[in-house]
């Protein structure tokens, strides 16, 4: 097993879009109406300096990054294939490491997650994100999404 993280390349967006978890595909469409390749490319371009790919045996199994709102606030995102959590402990350790690095740069991270995406919600809670409210009609499909955040000084 060779599981590691590197800076993303544009082609990672297309490669990952073919194997994305069904929950991520559903969340992408519900929030934006976009297909996986469009959403990944947009996320990559919006967070290029803070965009990373998770690799497993030479294949992209996940991408994540931070879209910067301003010098204090960022929007974290992560999309992955079913293989992303194949090695749960390694994935969790890397998640904490990169989250701590992001928290060194931003005072607040926030975003929204589809209420149906229970695996992502559990993962976010395990990383210390707080869920503030349920938005009953969010995004393109007007589905329920949770707002979540993590603040440096709370």
Functional labels for PLM-detected ranges:
Residues 72-85, 90, 146:
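Conserved acetyl-CoA binding element of GNAT-fold acetyltransferases
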Residues 87-101, 122, 126:
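Conserved acetyl-CoA-binding loop-helix of GNAT-fold acetyltransferases
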Residues 64-72, 135:
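A conserved beta-strand-loop-helix scaffold within acyl/acetyltransferase catalytic domains
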Residues 137-154:
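C-terminal "cap" of GNAT-fold acetyltransferases
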């Amino acid at each position: 097993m060779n599981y590691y993280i590197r800076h993303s390349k544009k082609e990672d967006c297309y490669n990952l879009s073919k194997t994305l978890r069904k929950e991520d595909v559903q969340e992408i469409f519900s929030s934006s109406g976009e297909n996986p390749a469009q959403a990944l490319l947009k996320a990559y371009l919006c967070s290029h300096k803070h965009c990373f790919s998770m690799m497993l045996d030479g294949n992209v199994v996940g991408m994540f990054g931070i879209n910067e709102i301003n010098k204090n606030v960022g929007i974290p995102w992560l999309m992955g294939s079913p293989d992303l959590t194949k090695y749960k402990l390694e994935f969790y350790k890397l998640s904490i490491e990169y989250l701590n690095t992001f928290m060194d740069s931003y005072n607040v991270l926030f975003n929204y997650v589809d209420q149906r995406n229970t695996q992502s919600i559990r993962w976010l809670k395990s990383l210390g994100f707080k869920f503030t409210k349920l938005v009953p009609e969010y995004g393109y499909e007007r589905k329920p999404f949770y707002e979540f955040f993590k603040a440096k000084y709370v």
